Amino acid sequence: MDRRIVKAAEEGNIYAMLSLAYMHHRGIDSEFDPLLAIEEYKRSASRGCTRAKWELAKIYRDGDIVEPNPYEFMHWLTAAADAGIPEAMMELVVRYWCGGLVLKDPSMAFEWLRKVAEQNYPLGEFFMGCAYLQGWNVEKDAAEAEAYFQRAREHGDADLFIRFGRNFEFGMAGIEVDLERAKYWYKCAADMGSDRGYYSLLAVEKVAKGGRYETPEERDRSFNDLPSVQEVRRRNKMLEEGDIHMEQGYYDKAVDRYMKAADLGNAEALYMLAILYHDGEIVRRNDDISYDYLDRAAIAGSTDAQLQLGKIYEEGRGRKQDRERALEMYAMAVANGNLIGYYELSRFMDHPEKFVRQRYRIVR
């Protein structure tokens, strides 16, 4: 385990505590230890780390590493929402709207929805638009609805747009069916290069012309035949075969499979090749090739590559020293779900969570 992080946690760095919790939670550089992970999350949360509060809420909600606990879940969910975590705020909207763990309270749901939309969180902006469109605990206002929908479009991504389109196409999440609005959101996704968005757009246009209406389940099955989904399967298969060959000692075959997976954009394969070309034990060492693969891995979403590039730019190893580029890489890793990036950022600033949110609307 990274001694820097351990030492910083001992000295009271709440983001080092968060990183330790994450590492125990995910089994990174340590044994998987759910109880120790929760202990570190709580230590971090009790000292003011808002992300730790949200992680605890999810742990007690999902029950993946400990038994679900509705009381602990609501405690940490409310704490995370009060601290301004938009994902927690959005979850609280649903809880107050539907009732169950809390008394059903549409007014409270709307108030939390308004707060999360004010943070430019696209999911909140979309449902705020729906609230004004359909009169959910507020007077209908078409102009306000369109304004919020426009904001959601500016801040969202293709996956969200498909979700919005499905809500209007199939009448999900309490939204009235509106095929024209469904087409609008599917087109937004298609314009960003999503073949799922394009397929859904064509499907709705066929329905408008009298064609057969697909169910959501049928739509999902149709997605399985799309080129993007088939490509993901191929590259994952190549990666899996590469790992098997590597474990068995068939290194030439392993490298071949990793290269094929990398050519299809697999982030893990790209990162593996970056490591192999840097180590020089299985292939001849070539740092130029290694850095190229590392760049591509980071772009493809490898948080390991993003953290490593952050360190490279920070220290000026093999690249010109660039503090701003280093911070961007650390923030990118966080946005893609690697909480160790918070510790790296905390060495440069007091509020790394705000820094990340200023750059990324959607943080995993």
PLM feature spans:
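Alpha-helical segment of the N-proximal tetratricopeptide repeat
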Residues: 3-11, 15-29, 234-253, 260
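Terminal, low-structured helical/coil segments at or just beyond the last alpha-helical repeat
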Residues: 200-230, 341-364
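Hydrophobic face of amphipathic alpha-helices that form TPR/SEL1-like repeat modules
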Residues: 19-26, 55-62, 91-98, 102, ...
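Structural signature of tandem alpha-helical TPR/SEL1-like repeats
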Residues: 2-3, 31-40, 67-76, 103-112, ...
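Short helix-capping/linker turns of helical repeat alpha-solenoids
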Residues: 10-13, 26-28, 46-49, 62-64, ...
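Canonical positions in the second alpha-helix
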Residues: 8, 43-44, 79-80, 115-116, ...
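TPR/TPR-like (Sel1-like) alpha-helical repeat modules
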Residues: 180-195, 202, 206, 219-220, ...
